[in-house]
Amino acid sequence: MKAESLEQAYELNQKRTACVLGGMVWLKMGNRIVTTAIDLSGLGLDTITETESEFVIGCMTPLRDLELHQGLHTYTKGAIRESLRHIVGVQFRNCATVGGSIWGRFGFSDVLTMLLALDTEVELFKGGRVCLSDFVKMPKDRDILVRIIIKKTPLKVVYLSQRNSKTDFPVLACCIRLSENGVRAVYGARPAKAFLLEDEEGLL
């Protein structure tokens, strides 16, 4: 069903057998029973808006749009493009959405590893803004992820991954960021979901 509003989508999603559709690249690999498929594609949530202080990314934005966005590329010194360019292929990244990638909290997710290193928040329809590092620890519920917000904190960041083949899932992924608040390191593909390490004692 194509939702006419977020309110309608939220109400429909309260059924246990309902499912919010993203790019459907991972959903089709599962075997869950879905009686109500909720399509958010008509709600204008597929854009990236850049302001002086942040990037606001709609949940339906394809990964390919993040990869090609010049503002994100410049801000992360190419790290976000590096984190995305190995994900399967261009056609796949044209379908897969950033919202689906973050909501899934997948252990193999390059996207989650990258965004955890930045000052990132998610906007939930009912839950409001939540820090991404807190969101990944939350149990999955029937809320809807609406947007991802990346604050433009001055930083230096680098992303690296090890793969057995070019377009395979990463064996290990790592994103390290340096800012005036210190060093933040994120390790992904462990195979558990990405792990954030804050250098609270200034050892790094």
Kindly give the residue locations of the regions a language model identified.
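C-terminal structural segment of proteins
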Residues: 1-204
